Amino acid sequence: MLDKLSQNYPKCSVFYKKLNDSQFFLGATPELIMKKTNNNLQTNALAGSKPVENKNELLNDSKIINEHDIVVKGIIDNLNSFNLKPNLDSKNILELKNIAHIITKINSQINDRHNPLDILDSLIPTAALSGYPKKESLKIIDSIENYERGRYAGPIGWIDQNMNCEFYAAIRTAYINKNKLYFYGGAGIIINSKAEEEWNEIEKKIKAIKNIINE
């Protein structure tokens, strides 16, 4: 199953975690939260989606650009709180098998005074997974969602003895609990969002793992 996910989604980070003998958590996520290599810190803003066949419309859609810019602003706010000076690449398109996203790569230089785990903690969840401003959005989520998100959208990755690390958001996932199977995916909702379009987007996102499990 993991081999198939890797083959079908080579631009995603594929993960699998056995929680116990009857519970498993797996997925294929394109969303890099943070990667530290020596003094370089990279994080990606990934927000704004269309079916892959309509990918060329992404950078000309004002609603999608607005959605993406909100996520960029949230990340910049977090990095600025550590007195970092983030540099933004130009908006680009990340093309996956059945869906495409706008991606902006953001790089910063850090030093030994910066604990990357503190930066990671500030970055999660990004505005794509919570909202903006984050503190107010999380309060609203707590008040209206009547279920726990569990491990969905949490950080998954690695860190070494030199504090180099790489973490992704655990999105587009499946949770297996005995004889029950749960799929997790989401979409960014802003003022001009249309419910049916957002639902269709979620369906496309979870299709990545759903189809492989059903094979």
Each predicted region: which residue ranges?
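A glycine-rich phosphate-binding loop feature that marks nucleotide/adenosyl-phosphate handling sites
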Residues: K18-F25, I75-I76, K91-N98, P155-I159
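Conserved hydrophobic core element of enzyme catalytic domains
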Residues: K105-E215
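An anion-binding catalytic pocket shared by soluble metabolic enzymes
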Residues: M1-N66, I70, M163-G186
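Contiguous alpha-helical scaffold segments within structured protein domains
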Residues: Q42-S143, N211-N214
